């Protein structure tokens, strides 16, 4: 298994109290494939450097994962299908 860092920018119209449950729903993909969610860090609402989908702000979350590469591809696919997710970025961490 490899370590990954996933940054997600969510739609700012979401209530910040509902961010953690919605992230949990996405992370079920990782847990289902016997991966491990090491850390979830929600940064909260921040101003974007440039507008994304006509939004000036976004709710940032950084997640550390330990899983297989196929699981990360599936997670990225699921996130991109959701309208509440503005942008994602997955980085593979060095050992």
UniProtKB/Swiss-Prot annotation:
A GO molecular function assigned to this protein is: structural constituent of ribosome
Q: Name one Pfam family in it.
A: Ribosomal_S6
Which Gene3D superfamilies has this protein been placed in?
3.30.70.60
In terms of SUPFAM superfamilies, this protein maps to: Ribosomal protein S6
Q: Which family does it belong to?
A: Belongs to the bacterial ribosomal protein bS6 family.
Does the UniProt entry include the keyword Oxidoreductase? no
Q: Name one GO biological process term.
A: translation
Give the keywords, sorted: Ribonucleoprotein, Ribosomal protein, RNA-binding, rRNA-binding
- Species this protein is from: Corynebacterium efficiens (strain DSM 44549 / YS-314 / AJ 12310 / JCM 11189 / NBRC 100395)
| Purpose | Binds together with bS18 to 16S ribosomal RNA.
CDD domains cross-referenced by the UniProt entry: bS6
Record's PROSITE patterns?
A: RIBOSOMAL_S6
> In the UniProt record, which is one GO cellular component term?
cytoplasm
Would you tell me the protein name for this molecule?
A: Small ribosomal subunit protein bS6
